[in-house]
UniProtKB/Swiss-Prot annotation:
Keywords: Cell inner membrane, Cell membrane, Membrane, Transmembrane, Transmembrane helix. It comes from Salmonella typhimurium (strain LT2 / SGSC1412 / ATCC 700720). InterPro entries: Fumarate_red_C, SQR/QFR_C/D. This is Fumarate reductase subunit C. Its main location: membrane. GO terms for cellular component: fumarate reductase complex; plasma membrane. Part of an enzyme complex containing four subunits: a flavoprotein (FrdA), an iron-sulfur protein (FrdB), and two hydrophobic anchor proteins (FrdC and FrdD).
Amino acid sequence: MTTKRKPYVRPMTSTWWKKLPFYRFYMLREGTAVPAVWFSIELIFGLFALKHGAESWMGFVGFLQNPVVVILNLITLAAALLHTKTWFELAPKAANIIVKDEKMGPEPIIKGLWVVTAVVTVVILYVALFW
């Protein structure tokens, strides 16, 4: 059975998401995947350079010292920190932790995640620099 009624289709521009700050921030957060891809490719390139000997590794280190690569890596670091911050803020919403018959607030969980991140970072830096 068909109908002759024409359904109402609300006009939607391609930039609809730019009007609300929530959606702009959502797109920014989802966009942090692009720098993560850059870092993944760079890391794989470095592993292959390490596999192929000292000369290849020195070429990779020279590549990393390029100012454009340094800027891209700083952008990647900022994107990773933004993604980490938003992820840590979402984590308490997924966990329902009850302490003394009261639901725990998100602050201790967020602070705990940042402490774990800082400790793991310090341990990795210590192993990389002094071991």
